[in-house]
Design a protein with these regions (language model features):
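A short, solvent-exposed, low-complexity linear motif enriched for acidic/polar residues
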Residues: 1-225
Length: 225
């Protein structure tokens, strides 16, 4: 069993190894021991959240039948191996339904570990009323202001973000396991534990394979979203 909330800040666990035919692939599916929402809450769920010391079952649509889809292009070489990272963002993946159930949305992504890069930096000029600063990575040009709107039921805010990170104790952030490319960083503020506003954007951060892009964030100089 894995506690996914412990696998943060670049920590990972091996899920397993298996053989595949050489070629290009675009997704994997994980068959998970999770109940269907139509089955009702199980008495002893294998996949669950701990809320106020109590187990709350975590449902996944078709997770035990068609599988939980992880998306990302990768190449399996002939007579070779490829290491994949399945990156899971709790801020997007877990949502509460109107009936008080928790479901796992299909937001996991795959990155070939040998190709992955990262973005990190310090954050300065933080608003006094901010309880949290969250940095979201978007593929270049993908962010629209509607991403920050109040989400519909069973949806999450910032749904098209590639990944995200919360500012740490030393006022820094790091966005792990990014495919090579250009990204925009959307900086959001939480007040008293809830989303408050988007503070601005850092545009055109370039990520290369096996390297870290340094992108310090001065909130007073952010571009207007």
């Amino acid at each position: 069993k894995f506690n996914l909330l412990e696998l943060t800040d670049g920590m990972d666990e091996m899920l397993g190894t298996f053989e595949m035919e050489a070629g290009q692939y675009n997704q994997l599916r994980f068959l998970m021991d999770m109940p269907e929402l139509s089955q009702g809450p199980p008495s002893n769920p294998e996949c669950y959240l701990m809320i106020n010391g109590e187990k709350e079952p975590l449902f996944v649509p078709s997770g035990g039948q068609s599988g939980y889809k992880a998306v990302g292009a990768f190449q399996v070489p002939s007579n070779g191996t490829v290491e994949l990272m399945a990156d899971w963002d709790a801020r997007k993946a877990v949502v509460e339904t109107g009936a008080g159930h928790y479901i796992l949305r299909p937001t996991i992504r795959l990155v070939a570990e040998g190709e992955a890069g990262s973005i990190s930096g310090g954050i300065t000029n933080i608003p006094d009323d901010a309880s949290k600063i969250i940095v979201y990575a978007y593929e270049d040009g993908d962010y629209e202001s509607a991403e920050a709107d109040e989400p519909a039921e069973e949806e999450s805010r910032f749904p098209d973000a590639v990944t995200s990170d919360e500012m740490g104790e030393e006022n820094g952030y790091k966005l792990w396991y990014l495919a090579p490319g250009t990204y925009d960083l959307v900086v959001a503020k939480n007040v008293n534990g809830s989303f408050d506003s988007v503070l601005g954007i850092v545009e055109d951060v370039k990520v290369e394979s096996n390297s870290n892009a340094n992108a310090p964030i001065d909130i007073s100089e952010l571009s207007t979203p």
